[in-house]
Curated annotation (Swiss-Prot):
Record-stated family: Belongs to the hssA/B family.
Any Pfam family the entry gives: Coiled
TM ranges: none
Protein known as: HssA/B-like protein 21
Organism of this sequence: Dictyostelium discoideum (Social amoeba)
InterPro entries, A to Z: HssA/B-related
Signal sequence, renumbered to the chain: none
Length: 89
């Protein structure tokens, strides 16, 4: 019985960890949008954005390994100059 209880507790910790990762992704996403609006006016696909966001993206990927795929998808559109990067939003 004790072993089953321990396994159950470990499962709960993993779930809590995942929800913390999701909230940190949400915060990081807001930061990336803010950086994008600060650098607006540089035209579509501004290469300078890649340098400014690079360190932040690296930190997000290391800190939230569970959802790396989601981070790459969301950040990829910002770094490659998606439609959101044309002028100020």
């Amino acid at each position: 019985m004790t072993i089953l209880g321990s396994i159950s507790s470990i499962g709960n910790v993993k779930l809590i960890s995942k929800s913390n990762n999701l909230s940190s992704l949400s915060n990081s996403s807001s930061s990336l949008q803010s950086m994008n609006s600060i650098q607006c006016g540089g035209g579509c696909g501004n290469g300078g954005l890649l340098g400014g966001v690079g360190g932040l993206v690296g930190g997000v990927l290391v800190g939230t390994g569970v959802i790396v795929g989601s981070v790459l998808h969301g950040v990829g559109s910002i770094l490659t100059g998606g439609s959101n990067n044309c002028g100020c939003n």
